[in-house]
């Protein structure tokens, strides 16, 4: 009996190629499923979800596969967006894409897959699953690898997931779409956080979090050098948008004191206080059980390089991560992913103090 695979289709070229490849294999009954997570219009007054769904319809018709749509807009606001706002208000810099994968795509969407009697869920993520269906590996394209965004998803939620693009380069995917004549072959990739789109981040956030003006302080001199409209708008390592003039060197955000509503800056991109030798990570998820301390590498941001480190489990369920070489702009609230070679061991949320303890 043929197995049924549900393809999470976004209206983009990646998920279109996933559906095409699985249909071409001929061993699956392929069903497309479009997931809508956000109701509002973009900065031009257009509903991007509607445009994306029309592309899904077109691809499904090209491939002669059935397709459905499901809205998780209410659940997304409750389980992802509300936490995103809370974290920012408290001075952290969360990664909503990691949270969306855990709470929506590989939880609620998996339930919909079961409702549709699907045996597998397939997505357009550039990563690879383990042979037993419960591991996670980097995608072969180092520029597109998305295992970082899945490091917080429980391994059980990935046990039936197919990643057809994990062994491909983006250029190959795009070329295949062109050769197959897929309607989305030349469609631009989506960028940024889905609910923000192309809008400036600050103008979006101030719709939900009121401005709270305060001082910008030079940490070395403890002198006020500027003012800000809200400490929550700034993240560690940030350079742009500080509006601090008269400095010999570029200024960077060192940290924030949310109780005092102060943003601390330092001068120079190589200022030693911008670098941290260690961090504490919480809310951990492991694909490979942590049996005592380990040596591995870690990514503290999606586009950051791998940093060699040692990981030590602590009694409260968190871990201490000690880097071989100090790492720049370690940011509370961001995701840290752990690797040994191509194997993603797991990940967690960075929970270091806001201000360096000197």
UniProtKB/Swiss-Prot annotation:
One annotated GO molecular function: tRNA binding
Active-site feature positions: 100, 194
Residues given in the record as ATP binding sites: 8-15, 35, 124
CDD domains given in the database record: MnmA_TRMU-like (cd01998)
Record bears the keyword DNA-binding: no
InterPro entries reported in the protein's UniProt record: MnmA-like (IPR004506), MnmA-like_C (IPR046885), MnmA-like_central (IPR046884), MnmA-like_central_sf (IPR023382), Rossmann-like_a/b/a_fold (IPR014729)
Pfam families the UniProt entry points to: tRNA_Me_trans, tRNA_Me_trans_C, tRNA_Me_trans_M
Localization, UniProt: Cytoplasm
Interaction with target base in tRNA: region residues: 95-97
Catalytic activity entry: S-sulfanyl-L-cysteinyl-[protein] + uridine(34) in tRNA + AH2 + ATP = 2-thiouridine(34) in tRNA + L-cysteinyl-[protein] + A + AMP + diphosphate + H(+)
EC number: 2.8.1.13
Protein task: Catalyzes the 2-thiolation of uridine at the wobble position (U34) of tRNA, leading to the formation of s(2)U34.
Cited PANTHER family: MITOCHONDRIAL TRNA-SPECIFIC 2-THIOURIDYLASE 1, TRNA 5-METHYLAMINOMETHYL-2-THIOURIDYLATE -METHYLTRANSFERASE
Name this protein carries in UniProt: tRNA-specific 2-thiouridylase MnmA
UniProt source species: Chlamydia muridarum (strain MoPn / Nigg)
Biological classification of the source: Bacteria, Pseudomonadati, Chlamydiota, Chlamydiia, Chlamydiales
